[in-house]
Amino acid sequence: MQIACKQAECMPGEPSAASPRSSPVGVGDVVVLEPGEAASFDAPLDLLVFALPVTPDRSVPRAIRPDWDPRITDTPGGCATDGKAYRRILLTWRGEVGPYTFHGLNVHRVRIDDSFTHYHPRVGGFDEFYLVQAVREGARLLTSVRTETIQQPASVRREDVPQLLQSMPLQQGDLVYLPRGVAHRGLGGVLAQVITVPGFVPGAEIGIDHHLHAINERLGLSGKEALPVHAAGALQPIVR
């Protein structure tokens, strides 16, 4: 599939519009448009569009193609820490993480098999979207709006436990919004475009698996009664 981009038509007396630019695009790619620029495609497709007050600088390609750009390679971390993880960094906050930086919106394309349970703080954090592009059977997302309760294990009663985490099955084409403060954990093999606004702010991924583990231990929960816990975060806090 091809995309063609050009500046909007000029009014009389204005300089002529620049020549159109074109690029192949596919699932997982990001297209950056300048203010006043229009885009056309040679085939139907679904797009998720963000209008931002600022645009990435010219060092960022106007079409970012994670499976074709030699500067973008698998970088384990975040929600996919396995050494063989598929994790492509399209737009990110820090230059040491990926080649293209932007403090307005970040995009990582990730296959999530088993992430740690975490949230992003309301102050100094970020909002997150999962645009689901492929799933394995059984892929799901655990979420919780009771993050503050989980962070106080001594206050949790046995009857509170069933309401602490919710399990959401995922399907290709889903768009999941995870506002600041909502805890979440991906499981089972979901390939998602993970989009954050304003971006992956350092230190704003706060793990809570050690709190979930503490609740299980304190209440003597085991088997199906126990809260699901990511092993790496069970015994010590994770902050990324």
Predicted segments with their positions:
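Conserved metal-binding segment of the jelly-roll/cupin
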Residues: 24-43, 52, 163-189, 195-197
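Short, conserved beta-strand element in jelly-roll/cupin
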Residues: 1-18, 122-157, 197
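A short glycine-rich, His/Asp/Glu-containing loop-to-beta-strand
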Residues: 87-133, 140-144
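Double-stranded beta-helix
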Residues: 43-86, 187-240
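Short, flexible, glycine/charge-rich loop motifs used to bind or transfer phosphoryl groups or to couple energy/partner
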Residues: 21, 119-120, 166
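N-terminal accessory/assembly segment that mediates macromolecular interactions
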Residues: 1-66
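Extracellular structured ligand-interaction cores
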Residues: 28, 47, 102-104, 126, ...
